[in-house]
């Protein structure tokens, strides 16, 4: 991929696709992680004498302006973390008004465009919109790894029209995740959780031949346990994936590690009655909502001595304190490998879990891209990444 140093930006206007799809409540940004993640690229461009025009999507508007999806609340947050004024441009990104506003920018100045999904052609990679957006810069930088798997106008469409390069964040993500696929150091342990096997099929398939152990947790564990003939009560199961899970167990049984015990609940609620039971003997009318203490210990042991670790997906319904112990145990175990193993955490829920556990600073790489991380690990070519080559 071309990096920032390949662009001559002095005195030029650089259009940067960032990922500012942040949680906003009552017009206030709740978490500025994605905003601060863009600073290395923005500061590098400003330092090289450019003016910077930032472009992002936010939420899922229906191809037109909607107040609740405006990026306006992000501007003051960006000003604060950047330490300089940010000009918010409220007109549609592809409009002549926006073009006029960005043409007035001086080197060292920063503008934030309105939500690019307010343009109906954005998600269709519309050629006319691609050209309108390309007018806004002399060069284009893609730094939105979280959107790199989308062939949209603001991701790959504009790239074809302008000199382009990958931003610091995009580069870091692709290199960090690449290490999990290309010659990972052994022992290589992957922890996969979350509700559904169907969401993770391709990742599981692509990684299983490369790993030494794959630890399964979360709701998906019961599809595997049922495939082994276990009794799962009212636990979450994907019946249409049971045969598939059985096939994986037959082919990779020596690598796949399943929970031996589970925290079962009499209903799906924070204050449900709970008991620890064998994972393949969930009582009738009960449901497994977390891995049990024996499994927590076994998974912690399985991680000891690992040289490469990837974790995606929680071990249980960690939003409820009664079912968070499994996820917290994995967070602690992965965090304890600092300086011994190369550790990567990806996927929204596992990132929240690692942040909640206070272990985030002990992880080598925390991925900002949910779907994009998984698609890269599935072995897919991402349109945004390909456009930067």
UniProtKB/Swiss-Prot annotation:
Q: Which SUPFAM superfamilies match?
A: Phosphoglycerate kinase
**Does the keyword section mention Manganese?**
no
- Give me the segments passing through the membrane: none
Provide the reaction this enzyme catalyses. (2R)-3-phosphoglycerate + ATP = (2R)-3-phospho-glyceroyl phosphate + ADP
Q: Which GO terms describe its cellular component?
A: cytosol
Originating organism: Deinococcus deserti (strain DSM 17065 / CIP 109153 / LMG 22923 / VCD115)
Q: What is its EC number?
A: 2.7.2.3
One GO MF term, please? ATP binding
Keywords annotated in UniProt: ATP-binding, Cytoplasm, Glycolysis, Kinase, Nucleotide-binding, Transferase
Q: What Pfam families does this protein's entry cite?
A: PGK
Q: What compartments host this protein? A: Cytoplasm
Residues reported in the UniProt entry to bind substrate: 19-21, 34, 57-60, 117, 150
- List the CDD domains hit by this protein, alphabetically: Phosphoglycerate_kinase
Q: What is this protein called?
A: Phosphoglycerate kinase
Q: Name one GO biological process term.
A: gluconeogenesis
